[in-house]
Amino acid sequence: MKWSNVNSNDSEVVKQSLVVSKSCGASQQTSDITVQVGPAGTIKATKDSSTAIQNLASYMTNAASCGTTILLSKAGDSVAALYAGADVYQSDVGPYLLNFKKQFKAGSQIIQSCDSSSKRDNTIGVYIVNSLDDLEGIDRALQTWSKGSCLDSDGHDLIQSKTTMLGVSEVSKRSDISSSLEGFLAPRAEDNFDKYNTGTDLCKNLKVKQRVCCSAGSLPDIIPKKQSDGTCGTYTIQTNDNCAEIAAHFGVTQDDIYDLNEDTWGWAGCGTNDLKADQVICLSEGNTPMPSPLSNAVCGPQMPDEFCTESPARTKAPGAFQSGKNGCISNCGTYIVNNDDAPENFYHVAYFEVFNLKRECLNMDVNEISDTSLTHVHFAFAGLTADFDVSFDNDEYKAQFEKFVKNDASYKRILSFGGWAESTSASTFQRYRDAVKSGNREKFAKNIKAFFEKYDGLDGIDFDWEYPGATDIPGVPAGSDSDDDNYLGFLKLMKSTIGDKSLSIALPASYWYLKTFPIAKMSDYVSYFIYMTYDLHGQWDYNNAYADVGCPSGDCLRSHVNKTETINSLAMITKAGVPASKIFVGVSSYGRSFGMVDPTCTGPMCKYGGAFDVSTAEAGSCTNTSGYISNAELNLIMQGVDSGASNYKGRTWYDEDSASDVMIYGTKGEITTWVAYMSDDTKEARIDWIKGLNFGGVTDWAIDLQELNLGVDPDSDEAQDLDLPALPTGCSSANWPDNLEDLRNKIDKIDLGCRAQAVVWVLIKILPDILDNYQSAADNYDEYFKYYAEWVRNGIDDSLPLFMWSDGQNYMDCKWSSTSDGSGDAACTEMHVPEGQPGQGEVSITYTVRDEDGFYKALQADYGIEKDWIVWKDIYADPENSLTCPPCPNLTKDCKPCTGHGVTYHNWPVKAADDDIDVPNLKDIIDTAVPNITTLQDVILGSFIEMRIGAMDASDEDVATALSMPVFMIADTTEQMKNITKIGKEQEKADDEAKVSFILDIVSIVLMIIPFAGEAVDAIGGVANVARAAYVVGEAGNAALSVYDIVKNPSSAPFAILGLVMGADASVVGKASKTTFTKAAAFRNALTEDTLSSFSKEFRANDAIVQDIVKACKRA
């Protein structure tokens, strides 16, 4: 476009020309797009980040550049990066960004419109970091977008939007071919192209490597054909291949590729990073191909040279093979087999970890097992003595077992032996190797038989020897080649010994450990196998090149309950000759967790840290093991996140690829940990799937990890002592209100035993908003204190005469003279002289402080005035002309007596100069209280968790009573802070009543938060110094002084309660003391009605709701 051809006097023409120039000469079209928005709360300084986005939007709105745009904008500490692809109408990016103001203000880090399968460069991406220290994240995001890929969007929200795209004017990999060909081909060539290629919309859908005609005729049939042996037509993936280009090159569609490869080895789809170099895929109908061999594979279809390869001898005789070959082996393919018939019954096993009692919390008594869906419960674990008899670690575990076999349960009661710890401990591992040997197994079997006779309620035994024949368990000598045969012989003898009692063993889902088990033969003697299809991945994968597909270093984030890998494991065991009906497939009630190297990277190629035996994952508060965390703990962490608890961060999502749930979390202010697990819904879906495959049942590790329990036998004396029978075994918070008013109105719908917990739940829900409002209000208080200090100083002159005409005279001597009534010299209380009377004549009074210590103490106590705040001067007062001749501050030539009937006061106290009066800045107390309020938030959440898991050694009612008082105090303070009107310059003319009210409000606020401020109060002279302003400007009985009466004693209820609960370390689950909350509740309960009346109406109303609820609970 040339401006010489534009009529610059025509504004519409100029405007249209500018629009065309901004589109770089290309056509424009409005496109519907899907925008992926990252989770809220990732970015902290949302005000700064929003400003950075506004700057980017402003620049882009006024930009007229062509091609790809990459911009960075910094505001405060936040840095925002923008990527806008070459096919995006750049000037429309600004308004597009402003559509997401709400998401940016909420703290979203990533917003991207991105399609990695598109051939156009139409990505719009924004990536924000909290500081310059995090620029690596921006670099990674920009590189990803510039390569045509997209950032991981797991857990992102999807929002439909619109923006303007361009038709580009040059051919490129990502260009729109239909518009690019115009002008690219010479007119004659373009005519020929259309002549030889007549397909509808061909240009619009052209792909790289797609074949077209350059002459008359038709294209050859290039679709691969089925091979002569029935194998499909294959293609070997090359580096940087993608499905779109492969489909175009071979004349098929991407949908065809998906359909043809549903059963192909290693097929993961067409997504980013899904195709692997050297992977073999199908491009036609036919049998699935053999995968490419791996030189280091020792089994399976990728083992070099042989899998399902026929190699008959030259004679072709049956069973005769070429030298060194095995022929077509029996386990060809990757399908689950031996599952044609459904079992007679589908069973549901759960393990009970008796060692849960060693945990500091999340305890469960064996009599708390109440799941009616269970058909078997395995009591884990018993051990072996040196002479092959049954043992328990301690008397407590044995007592639990004896209750287990005596209870009247609907499920089968099975005792499990071994486990990982006993199988690998230096003191016990050899016992399992020896017990199954031919010389010992009979003795062991007899001992087991005697054990059954002693405990006739026992229905079976289960052996969890981990693992016979294993050679790589750290700290354990390599197993013997005879372990497998010994184990088989032992099982054969054990089955004949125990008769119709149940016999089962646990099997690993790993080929390396399973290969030593003669499982096909074992299946003749066991009732079922416990197949541990959990722990498929864990910290032990670290630095293992064979642990994670596509992850040579073994340190990639992978799910330990991955469904695809579970399928492979099930194929492995069924192909080994075990009928599906005898296999109980593992599901889990815990997660395997990893410390993330990059908390923003959550996909299967992202890395975790640590070492083979060192996990950097955040440990659960009860299981207390990095890398392993219970579902119950994960649920509690998300409760903390959902309730806005300080330092709790996290989010969850369902991962389709692994068919498992994923959570990232951190409880110390930052997300640090990735964990894969099964939620209840996921577990139910997995169980239904397993049942549909005709397996015999499922086995769940472990029932005590699922949810919170009391950890006490409901029928025991201990339960009676703790008054536990009245408590329900679980309090669901799903429908609890999140404010006190609704809680009071709906309290009848909540079980009595759960109501105190519901109170604490409400405290958790309301405290974040209280804290936010407190901090917001506190931001304006620097301005407020300027007026506060000024008005306190101005009140001194009003208060001094009141003191001098009352208690002040008790500490002074007077010398006086009067023209009408003589003179004298005595204590001021005995002075007789006319003052303030018409016609009195001239009066002169000189004051001398007799008891200086008593004078200043009384002045401070009664009126809050410090010694340094006054000076002693001579002043004059005229009673006859007070309206026109006010009292003179001193006798100077500028202030002469107005009449002959005044009074001269010598050595009279007056306000010192403003600069000499240091009014404490109470803002310091307001600011200092914030960290302690935040800590209180953590304490309440920690206490709630203890209540939920049954680790709180105190009554729920005492906990609710103790925690509510400090919350209501800070809530009351916040409301007062919000209600103080911002003081502007016009308020300098406020009347005296308004000024006094303002000062008293501020003093009341600060006094109420003093229990939260700690040493900051001492820095300004203590509580009395805070209250001083109320004495200077107020009067006895004002509201501020009533609050002062509450908090002036360090042992009063607010101080005592806060000190107890803040010192309880309740933010660490299991650490709270029963006496802590009992004592704190006692301080609240000891408050009299008179004392309570000193608190605000709102405080008393909230407190009354809590008291009514907890008293009803105690009466029940």
From Swiss-Prot:
GO terms for biological process, alphabetical: chitin catabolic process; polysaccharide catabolic process
Stored Gene3D superfamilies: 3.10.50.10, Glycosidases, LysM domain
KW Hydrolase (keyword) present: yes
PROSITE patterns linked: GH18_1, GH18_2, LYSM
UniProt GO MF annotations: chitin binding; endochitinase activity
Record EC number: 3.2.1.14
One Pfam family matching this protein: LysM
Binding site for chitin: 467, 701
UniProt entry keywords in alphabetical sequence: Carbohydrate metabolism, Chitin degradation, Chitin-binding, Glycosidase, Hydrolase, Polysaccharide degradation, Virulence
Family as reported in the entry's similarity comment: Belongs to the glycosyl hydrolase 18 family. Chitinase class V subfamily.
Name listed for the protein in its UniProt record: Probable chitinase LysM11
Organism: Penicillium expansum
Gene name of the record: LysM11
